[in-house]
Design a protein with these regions (language model features):
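Nucleotide-activated donor-binding/catalytic signature segment of Leloir-type glycosyltransferases, i.e.
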Residues: 213-230
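Conserved catalytic-core segment of nucleotide-activated headgroup transferases in glycan assembly
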Residues: 160-217
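Conserved active-site histidine-acidic residue motif and adjacent donor-binding/catalytic loop
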Residues: 208-209, 227-238
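Conserved acidic donor-binding segment of nucleotide-sugar-dependent glycosyltransferases
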Residues: 283-293, 300-306
Length: 332
């Protein structure tokens, strides 16, 4: 039929064809063939049945599932499977379940990175009872961990560890009196109050689009710089230069701003109606719009006293559930 895709060729970065997907008349993928460097099919996956056919050393191996295929591969390669780290209770768990350790009892780690329902998943309960594989379950989100603790029995609780995240901080906070705001709207909560109450702070406001006349009108304040159609290089420069990020735009977040500010050790302040990412902002640093003067006082305090800035950044990292290398070494 005209306009329908019947096959798609997949190339690697060097331009070599390594796979081809075929589709039926309803545009549903039916088969994927994987080629070796001689353009010979070595793996064929049937998406309708789940079967995988592998041609290895002149012999055909037929697997009824991806789990069987992965188990065969790990055993064929001779990998040590006495310790498996995985983050899914689907195929990775089923693979671990099927593997028997060579030496005693295996020691696995499951990184649980999903939300949790009103009961522990069935496969999670099975994992805790495997006779041949011991498991520790690392939960990085604190709220998910707390919910799991409310659902688990005393016997199950010992398997769970709240471990948090390791962040790659790009620099230290230098207490520069410069604040960054990135926005694609001209609605910035309490911006004129902030500009007038903080004359010694320079505000850099960037947008990846044109700016409205309302926003361009802020140029009348001496302590503001506007960047319509801001370029990536200028964004990077401002994240490196400013030590405050104000999450105050009444619209969608752009450029992953809160996380980038967090990783640059910038203190992030926001309002309740503009907060885009509570994960990277301490509760104490989220204000009611009518309480803008409290935000002003906070900014003045952290730019005046090193201890105030240090304490505020510590709260921010605690909100983001920061972990240490030592915590990871203990579980890994």
């Amino acid at each position: 039929t005209e306009g329908q895709v019947r096959a798609a060729d997949i190339y690697n970065r060097k331009g070599r064809l390594f796979a081809q997907i075929t589709y039926d008349q309803t545009q549903r993928p039916t088969h994927t063939r994987y080629f070796d460097q001689n353009n010979v099919v070595v793996i064929m996956e049937n998406h309708l049945t789940g079967d995988i056919i592998l041609t290895l050393e002149g012999k055909r191996h037929i697997f009824k599932s991806k789990q069987e295929f992965v188990v065969f591969y790990l055993q064929y390669r001779g990998y040590d499977t006495d310790r498996i780290i995985y983050n899914s209770l689907a195929t990775p768990f089923l693979v671990a379940y099927a593997l028997r350790p060579k030496n005693g009892r295996a020691e696995d780690v499951l990184f649980w990175q999903e939300s949790i329902g009103e009961a522990l998943p069935g496969n999670m309960k099975v994992a805790m009872k495997m006779p041949h594989r011991n498991i520790r379950i690392a939960v990085q989100d604190r709220q998910v961990y707390e919910k799991i603790q409310s659902l688990a029995t005393p016997e199950e609780k010992v398997y769970f560890h709240n471990i948090g995240y390791i962040y790659d901080y790009q620099r230290l906070n230098n207490m520069n009196p410069e604040a960054l705001i990135l926005t694609n709207s001209d609605q910035l909560e309490q911006i004129e109050q902030l500009l007038t109450q903080l004359p010694n702070v320079h505000f850099h406001i960037g947008a990846i689009t044109e700016m409205s006349g309302h926003l361009m009108g802020l140029n009348r304040y001496p302590n503001v710089s506007l960047y319509p159609n801001i370029r990536p290089a200028k964004v990077a420069e401002l994240f490196d230069r400013c030590d405050l990020y104000l999450d105050i735009n009444i619209s969608d977040e752009i450029l992953n701003a809160c996380r980038t500010a967090f990783e640059n050790n910038m203190l992030i302040l926001s309002f309740k109606n503009t907060c885009h990412s509570r994960r990277f902002i301490a509760d104490d640093h989220i204000y009611l719009p009518e309480n803008v003067l409290a935000m002003v006082e906070k900014i003045q305090a952290v730019l005046t006293h090193t201890a105030e800035m240090g304490s505020a950044l510590d709260k921010q990292k605690q909100a983001a559930n920061q972990a240490s290398l030592e915590q990871y070494k203990a579980i890994l």
